[in-house]
From Swiss-Prot:
Family statement: In the N-terminal section; belongs to the complex I 30 kDa subunit family.
Any Pfam family hit: Complex1_30kDa
Protein name per the record: NADH-quinone oxidoreductase subunit C/D
UniProt xrefs under PROSITE patterns: COMPLEX1_49K
NCBIfam families: NuoC_fam (TIGR01961), NuoD (TIGR01962), PRK06075.1 (NF004739), PRK11742.1 (NF008728)
Membrane topology classification: Peripheral membrane protein
Protein function: NDH-1 shuttles electrons from NADH, via FMN and iron-sulfur (Fe-S) centers, to quinones in the respiratory chain. The immediate electron acceptor for the enzyme in this species is believed to be ubiquinone. Couples the redox reaction to proton translocation (for every two electrons transferred, four hydrogen ions are translocated across the cytoplasmic membrane), and thus conserves the redox energy in a proton gradient.
Top-rank taxon, per record: Bacteria
Amino acid sequence: MIDLMPKKNTFLLKKKYKEDSNNSVINNLFDFFGKEFCFHQITLTGFPIIWIDKTLLIEVGKFLYHLSQPYIMLYDLHGVDERIRLHREDLPKADFSVFYHLISIERNSDIMIKVPLLENDLILPTFTGLFPNANWYERETWDMFGIIFNNHPNLTRIIMPSTWKGHPLRKNYSARATEYEPFFLNEQKEDLEMEGLKFKPELWGMKRKNDNVEFMFLNLGPNHPSAHGAFRIVLQLDGENIVDCVPDIGYHHRGAEKMAERQSWHSYIPYTDRIEYLGGCVNELPYVLAVEKLANISVPEKAEVIRVMMSELFRINSHLLYISTFIQDVGCMTPVFFAFTDRQKIYDLIEAITGARMHPAWFRIGGVANDLPQGWNILLKEFLDWMPKRLKYYINTALKNSILIHRSKGIAEYNKKEALQWGVTGAGLRATGLNFDVRKWRPYSGYQNYTFEVPVGSGISDCYSRVMIKVEEIYQSLFILKQCLCNMPSGPFKSEDSLTTPPSKECVFQNIETMITHFLQVSWGPVIPENESFQMIEATKGINSYYLISDGGTMSYRTRIRTPSFPHLQQIPSVIRGSLISDLIVYLGSIDFVMSDVDR
């Protein structure tokens, strides 16, 4: 094991560091902090992973944040229970680790900082002074692993109920309900749970009154149509003005990351559909791509085109629901019924291809489940002829309506700097004028072969600009679908790799080893080599990604699912303070989120 503990903070004694632009960020880190205090882990993630001692964490964060091309977005932050990991001989000694995934927009590159921790010292300094969006990520890391972040503004549970015992993502916390005592909700327990839901303003630094006014505290949700799911926001009100608010999440949590530790690499695919239940196949894509990296599996060209086609169909489907419900939130009912008619056409096409509608579980490691059926092209062409006219109808009848424009333009504004501070991705970020679409910047599944534009805003993201970005994205998705229709290649729809595809009858009858391998993989699942991989995609609501750790087994050792909706909801208080309740309703409609995506 490697000791990263510096004997003294030698980097603090150096003069102001002059960055070498010809050096990689790794070498700049090594030059400044000393190579002996940094360990570079080689993985299949596609970006450098640097282990450092926790005493250097804040300084390393500041160093990366203040580079000439800075790592300006904290993309993700979470933990790993390292205690029973078998293949970590060359890594620093650790019972737990916390990783900090940072993105540099100017470099179009990522870096991950990992901090090893021992079980008797699970304490780290908070990152919130540098990145405000670290707040919720640190709360979730404490919630799931019990790692403490010193000087955190309010280190309380965020996903699990406040009455919960234990930290679910620890390896000694069972994933099976059968290993626990039967659960009974008697009157005493019910009272305890209800007390746990009671909001206490003082715990959040809120005053009940000031010299002139006594504030009202109002629960919006968790069962309110404008909350778009099981989501509660506690509002501190002065009349109808929002003084402050506290989003409360976790009601839709299903333990998706824990489930991945007890499912085979194949059998976890259906769970990915339900992370963001409107995205369908889009959610499957980052997972199967990450597993394919681990297994070094190449995907046939036809499978890549089919994956893109299905992803864009689900993108349009999700955007139609978003646009129509946004219009409904502002006060117009008719478009939502028209949108469901249009979405039915998409579902008919999806069902014809996959056999299912919302949750097909159709992508496979190495390809897709089946070849395209006869007549798929006719259904797709009919939809491509239909949709542009309908989209024009939405724009002319609703989105150009003066009342809607007045209710949404200039409401819930933020700029590019604020968006990056809070980890905003997708249409919300692009509305600020930043052209960052993973399909263009970091192409996957052959997106580099398609011609399409990335819609961007004029500099300020408000409710109206966010919805209009999504409208234009539908046009671009239709253009991509037309290219899929005209250029669908022939050939196989899945890889012939033995990890993904059963062998042919000829091979089975001629080679006993082939039959044995097939039996083991069908019975227990394929064994994926030990390593780490990462894949991000441009999902329907922003950037979605899977960070996978394989320990050389038939199941994932750690599956981290980073969803866009989680940071988008964390941003709400900073945007909506000082606004009216009616503005909050429009703002919530403009974010585009579902709670399954937030809570996982």
